[in-house]
Amino acid sequence: GAPAIVFGTNPENGMFFVGTKSVFNKRQVKINYTYDDIAKNHQGNVADILRLCLRYLPHIDGIVQADWIGVGGGSVYRPNTLEYKFATPINQQIILAPHTSYTEVSPDAEAKIGVTIQSTNYCRFIDTMDAEIKRPNLLKDVAEIAALIPFCKVSDNKYARSYCRQLVNKFIRMGKIPNAEFMHNILEAKYKGEVNVTTFKVWHKLFQLKQRLLDAIVVNGNVECYIDGEPTRHEGFVTVSTNPYKLVDRLTFSKANFNLSKNW
């Protein structure tokens, strides 16, 4: 969903607020306690969404980040790349998917993944904790990656690293990833010595490993997902742990996100 909504009670003054991730800015913090604050800090659709949030969100004690899904009354929503289809129409005024909590409003605020909030008469909170992983046997995959790493050349050149990322993203936009040899062969001459074919082989192996993990995830909820009318799975998953890790189906969703026109 989008945009990201941050809301809750600021422990510094005990006041309820709403905002986007700009509440965590180092400079020009945009935190909204009133409708006047929203008018001063935001404009357009984001301002309209924040006004609805200020009116209808419950005044919780903590601080939560959620994805905006939409205004109630329907059963199909497309806040961003994905289109969500609910089994029955949503009766509440607004719909959000909470996923992260904080203890303070600060640029250094520590994020804790995993939030469940009870829906109210005015706000429907989507359960983002309704997935589990059926642990696959990945020992062979890990062993193959470990065997390649000693022969993998990693560049200290930040420009070379950035260039390689851009190259990978270029192919993801196209929805196709060529083999490691091809990717190394098309590098600009000045970067070819910064990495080797094994570098891309390791990337390929890690990509395949993440895909296997994604295939092992089971979603228990009944929300259906679509991209351009075609059924698809959820965009990504984050492990609930002290060291959270995000898994995203890059070929499907990163490609769609790269080519997305925001509708908010």
Question: Model regions: which residues?
Answer:
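Core nucleotide-handling region used for phosphoryl-transfer chemistry
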Residues: 3, 8-264
